[in-house]
Amino acid sequence: MENGTEGKNFYIPMNNRTGLVRSPYEYPQYYLADPWQFKLLGIYMFFLILTGFPINALTLVVTAQNKKLRQPLNFILVNLAVAGLIMVCFGFTVCIYSCMVGYFSLGPLGCTIEGFMATLGGQVSLWSLVVLAIERYIVVCKPMGSFKFTATHSAAGCAFTWIMASSCAVPPLVGWSRYIPEGIQVSCGPDYYTLAPGFNNESFVMYMFSCHFCVPVFTIFFTYGSLVMTVKAAAAQQQDSASTQKAEKEVTRMCFLMVLGFLLAWVPYASYAAWIFFNRGAAFSAMSMAIPSFFSKSSALFNPIIYILLNKQFRNCMLATIGMGGMVEDETSVSTSKTEVSTAA
């Protein structure tokens, strides 16, 4: 390609007329970015591990320890924490090492494994947010009447996230697209960059962008938008109720944070990947792709902060577990927490 160099199982966004391009599996890629930039990204990933792992792991611990957290509407939050742990353990650790040495030293097979696990975890996380939005929409807006969520419904929602995630992460393993190093060549993802014969990258990227980005975006905007409208309508009917007005503001704030968190994680990465795909051959720097790629990994940290730590019931249990606070046992607080779980937590 005019502005890049395609090799076996890799694509470097630099023309080899420079004579600098080397395999990202064998040589440091310091011609793509300064060594300190590699180290800085490695430090950033280390920060995500130090913060993301404890929060996600603690979510599983407190759920196992506290029966009151093991209610159907919380299943998807546990699923979200599992997705975060997959990203941290199987993606971030490998990425840190690659940043420190300056290239993806684990080879094509390691790249495929890392790319698959990172994509799987990221997609489970993404679809968990979709299922969570739908659950809240059903509970608050009641499009199905007085529908009662059971453990079976919630388990089906969790299973759905893994099915959808697998439908995105598995195809590159079996020849529909492939996993290659991206950005500064220290982490791996689907091939948005090349028209490599036999991989049908064009159809895969279009499928991934439409089904695994546009559909979730539309669903989340529709459900949370409907939720806010419903709560505002209820608040308008009870203008004299201070508690109702406060609840309306809280729900609006939480919905805003949820949508904002989703957009910050996925829009930069998906948009830039789409631009690369639809402007194939156009010049772009490795770092310009690395930044949105690395930023999307932040979802392993701020998703549990938004969806779990801001949930009073989970937060109280976590504080009690680490010895920094007691559970709020009075009936009013528990009732408030349960309402938060089903509406705006």
UniProtKB/Swiss-Prot annotation:
<keyword id="KW-0472">Membrane</keyword>
<keyword id="KW-0807">Transducer</keyword>
<feature type="glycosylation site" description="N-linked (GlcNAc...) asparagine">
    <location>
        <position position="201"/>
    </location>
</feature>
<dbReference type="InterPro" id="IPR050125">
    <property type="entry name" value="GPCR_opsins"/>
</dbReference>
<feature type="topological domain" description="Cytoplasmic">
    <location>
        <begin position="63"/>
        <end position="74"/>
    </location>
</feature>
<dbReference type="GO" id="GO:0071482">
    <property type="term" value="P:cellular response to light stimulus"/>
</dbReference>
<dbReference type="GO" id="GO:0005886">
    <property type="term" value="C:plasma membrane"/>
</dbReference>
<feature type="transmembrane region" description="Helical; Name=3">
    <location>
        <begin position="115"/>
        <end position="134"/>
    </location>
</feature>
<dbReference type="GO" id="GO:0008020">
    <property type="term" value="F:G protein-coupled photoreceptor activity"/>
</dbReference>
<feature type="topological domain" description="Extracellular">
    <location>
        <begin position="278"/>
        <end position="285"/>
    </location>
</feature>
<keyword id="KW-0812">Transmembrane</keyword>
<keyword id="KW-0297">G-protein coupled receptor</keyword>
<dbReference type="InterPro" id="IPR027430">
    <property type="entry name" value="Retinal_BS"/>
</dbReference>
<dbReference type="InterPro" id="IPR017452">
    <property type="entry name" value="GPCR_Rhodpsn_7TM"/>
</dbReference>
<keyword id="KW-0325">Glycoprotein</keyword>
<comment type="similarity">
    <text>Belongs to the G-protein coupled receptor 1 family. Opsin subfamily.</text>
</comment>
<keyword id="KW-0600">Photoreceptor protein</keyword>
<feature type="transmembrane region" description="Helical; Name=6">
    <location>
        <begin position="254"/>
        <end position="277"/>
    </location>
</feature>
<keyword id="KW-0597">Phosphoprotein</keyword>
<keyword id="KW-1133">Transmembrane helix</keyword>
<dbReference type="InterPro" id="IPR000732">
    <property type="entry name" value="Rhodopsin"/>
</dbReference>
<feature type="transmembrane region" description="Helical; Name=2">
    <location>
        <begin position="75"/>
        <end position="100"/>
    </location>
</feature>
<feature type="transmembrane region" description="Helical; Name=5">
    <location>
        <begin position="204"/>
        <end position="231"/>
    </location>
</feature>
<keyword id="KW-0716">Sensory transduction</keyword>
<feature type="modified residue" description="N6-(retinylidene)lysine">
    <location>
        <position position="297"/>
    </location>
</feature>
<feature type="transmembrane region" description="Helical; Name=4">
    <location>
        <begin position="154"/>
        <end position="177"/>
    </location>
</feature>
<feature type="topological domain" description="Cytoplasmic">
    <location>
        <begin position="135"/>
        <end position="153"/>
    </location>
</feature>
<dbReference type="Pfam" id="PF10413">
    <property type="entry name" value="Rhodopsin_N"/>
</dbReference>
<feature type="disulfide bond">
    <location>
        <begin position="111"/>
        <end position="188"/>
    </location>
</feature>
<feature type="glycosylation site" description="N-linked (GlcNAc...) asparagine">
    <location>
        <position position="16"/>
    </location>
</feature>
<dbReference type="GO" id="GO:0007602">
    <property type="term" value="P:phototransduction"/>
</dbReference>
<dbReference type="GO" id="GO:0007601">
    <property type="term" value="P:visual perception"/>
</dbReference>
<comment type="function">
    <text>Visual pigments are the light-absorbing molecules that mediate vision. They consist of an apoprotein, opsin, covalently linked to cis-retinal.</text>
</comment>
<keyword id="KW-0675">Receptor</keyword>
<dbReference type="InterPro" id="IPR001760">
    <property type="entry name" value="Opsin"/>
</dbReference>
<keyword id="KW-0844">Vision</keyword>
<feature type="topological domain" description="Cytoplasmic">
    <location>
        <begin position="232"/>
        <end position="253"/>
    </location>
</feature>
<feature type="topological domain" description="Extracellular">
    <location>
        <begin position="178"/>
        <end position="203"/>
    </location>
</feature>
<feature type="transmembrane region" description="Helical; Name=1">
    <location>
        <begin position="38"/>
        <end position="62"/>
    </location>
</feature>
<feature type="topological domain" description="Cytoplasmic">
    <location>
        <begin position="311"/>
        <end position="345"/>
    </location>
</feature>
<feature type="topological domain" description="Extracellular">
    <location>
        <begin position="1"/>
        <end position="37"/>
    </location>
</feature>
<dbReference type="InterPro" id="IPR019477">
    <property type="entry name" value="Rhodopsin_N"/>
</dbReference>
